[in-house]
Amino acid sequence: MVTNMVKLRNLRRLYCSSRLLRTIQNGRISSVSSISLSKKYTTKSAKEGEENVERKHEEEKKDTLKSSSVPTSRISRLFHYGSLAAGVGMNAAAKGISEVAKGNSPTWKSLILSDSNIDRITNKFSKMRGVALKIGQLLSFQDEKVLPKELYEILSRVQNSANHMPQRQLEKVMAKELGANWKTKFSKFDKIPMAAASIGQVHAAELPSGQRVVVKIQYPGVKESIDSDLNSLLMLLTASSLLPKGLFLDKTIANARTELKWECDYNREARALQKFEALLKDDPAFEVPHVFPEYTTDNIITMTRMEGTEIMKLPKASQETKNFISENIMRLCLEEIATFKYMQTDPNWANFLYNGRTKKIELLDFGASRPFAEDFILKYRKLLTYATLRDRKGAYEMSVQLGYLTGLESQSMKDAHVDSVLTLGEPFRGDVDKSFDFKDQTVSDRIRGNIGLMLNERLCPPPEETYSLHRKFSGIFLLCARMGASVHCAKLFKEIFAYKV
């Protein structure tokens, strides 16, 4: 009897939740949209046979990229979120009734994240672009053991699955931004984008001067619907109860709101590009695209076309090359924090290209670039320095000063946090003449072992700077591990980051 009552209560919850989610369609709950992340503008070919290669790429793009209009108004986006919520809720309710009729006791998460619902969510996010895709990208850098595996599958699938604008919508955007005669400003402009991402798509083009460029075009309506889209997404994620409380979803959403608005400001991104171009102009390992201001607006950025290949798609790269790439990206990450106090925080590996001809790493997508306050940088450098020294007392005190801990946590929570901090410092510890082998590292696994306890017992969200900073660090660590790289982390840390404590 008790079991049946529990089953009926669960089904009632499913039914009520699906009705709650449908209220979005009636405008009773506000919604939100937007973001940017770029799925890189790269070319593999050399100049010889350029026309044939590019024609071949056009055909490949037609096969791999889907076209669909971007919902531009707040009402239309609200409707799409509402229909998604209703569809997921009703599908879950129907499946729940079917399972109970068979004598099974399905869990809430298994009903929400059924195969059909995973497909439904992925397809809708790809059509919506904007916030839906960006939140997916942000959360996808959480460890897969933190999130339900079905949700992690959705997030992984949506990372690079945006549809692109149909031709008519594209031409309307270009005419609005560059004028009715916009086509005369280019000697070439590929109609099919090289890539389509969360807030925009990228087209190969050529200026009348012969300069090869890429044109990054923001989807219409994405910027204006950030707040409403985020509100809708927050409601969906909260109603589904899919995320652990320790993720502090409201803080994650607030951070995403800020970053999305940054990334939708293409003039801001253009300034970030120019800043990094100046910072790295004499760096032998890096190259940054040059911005063409006369072809750049609030919603379009035109920049030089990088000729490298995504680092994870390098054909038969030697281990020496992989070590070179990994070590220099790690160096840049440390310099961004300690020296520049200004970081490109997007961890997407497709932001890094390697040019075999110039032997340089080409950097892309600066929409998520941000400054860090001097006080935060000072304390964070001290924290990691204590970690490399295995100084538990110093690491704990600095964690409280930074706001990671309140001091009121259980001893097990304090110990788990300090253990994780000291583990994070491990690659940067030891002999400066020795490299750290990421291929056999267990740092991620050991930090992962504390995640469950920390999610359950965390009393406060981490400082807002941490969301983007640790996302970048996590992405770089994973990159080095995927490359199987050996990196002189201790040497880099001592030269760039260490603070005398």
UniProtKB/Swiss-Prot annotation:
Region (Disordered): which ranges?
A: 41-69
The Protein kinase domain sits at 188-501
User: GO molecular-function annotation terms?
Assistant: ATP binding; ATP hydrolysis activity; kinase activity; lipid binding; protein kinase activity
User: Could you share any additional remarks the record makes about this protein?
Assistant: Present with 952 molecules/cell in log phase SD medium.
Tell me the pathway.
Cofactor biosynthesis; ubiquinone biosynthesis
Question: Domain remarks in the entry?
Answer: Adopts an atypical protein kinase-like fold: while it adopts a core fold similar to that of well-characterized protein kinase-like domains. The KxGQ motif completely occludes the typical substrate binding pocket. Nucleotide-binding opens the substrate binding pocket and flips the active site from inside the hydrophobic core into a catalytically competent, solvent-exposed posture.
The transit peptide extends across: 1-29
Task: Please report, in chain numbering, the residue ranges of the motif KxGQ motif.
Answer: 134-137
- State how it assembles: Forms homopolymers. Predominantly associated with a complex of about 500 kDa.
- The name under which this protein is listed is Atypical kinase COQ8, mitochondrial
Q: What is the effect of changing residue 365 to N?
A: Abolishes coenzyme Q biosynthesis. Enhanced autophosphorylation in cis
Q: What is its EC number?
A: 2.7.-.-
Q: What is the effect of changing residue 269 to Q?
A: Abolishes coenzyme Q biosynthesis
Subcellular compartments = Mitochondrion inner membrane
Matching SUPFAM superfamilies: Protein kinase-like (PK-like)
**Which protein family is it in?**
Belongs to the protein kinase superfamily. ADCK protein kinase family.
